[in-house]
Amino acid sequence: MKQYRQGAWKCLAFLFMLAVVIGALAGCSGKQDGEELSAAAVAERIQRAVNLDEMNQGDRKKLHKLYHLDADEVEDFILYTAASNVKADELAVIKVKDADQAESVKQNILQRIEAQTVKFKDYRPEEYFLIEKHVLKTKGRFVFFAVSKEAAQMEAAFDSAW
C-alpha cells in the first residue's frame, strides 16, 4: 500500500510540473507587438472608450486626400473626420505593410497637422487648441493620430489594444 501511495504522489507531482510548463509556454507564445491585430479591432476598442457618432468614417480616397498615402503603403486603416469643415476632429489608425514605412506615414500626418494649424489658427482658436494638443504615435506597424477633446481617452484605448 505504501508503494502505491508513493507512486501516486510521484504521478501527481509530474502532472503538476507538466501543467506549470504548459502554462509557461502558453504565456510566452503571445502575439508579438500586435502584428496580428487589425485596424478595425483597434477602432472597436476606441469606439468603446469614446463616442464617434458625430464623426464621418473615411475611405481610401479620403485617406489619400488628407495624408497623401498610397494603397501600396497601407495594409489596413480606419479614419474618422469631423462632420463639418469648421471642426478639426480627426482619428486615424493606420497599419502599414512594413514597420519601416511608419515613419514616412508619420511625416505625412505632420504635414496635415501643419496645414490644419494654418487653417484654424486665427479662424477657430478653440479648434486650433485641439490641433496643438494632438496625439501622434507609432507602435509596431501602427500609426495613431487623434485630434479631439477626447484624444487622451482615444490614446489610452489604442495603447490597451496590446
Locations of regions flagged by a protein language model:
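A short, solvent-exposed beta-edge/loop patch
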Residues: 83, 126-162
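A short acidic-to-branched-hydrophobic micro-motif
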Residues: 88-98
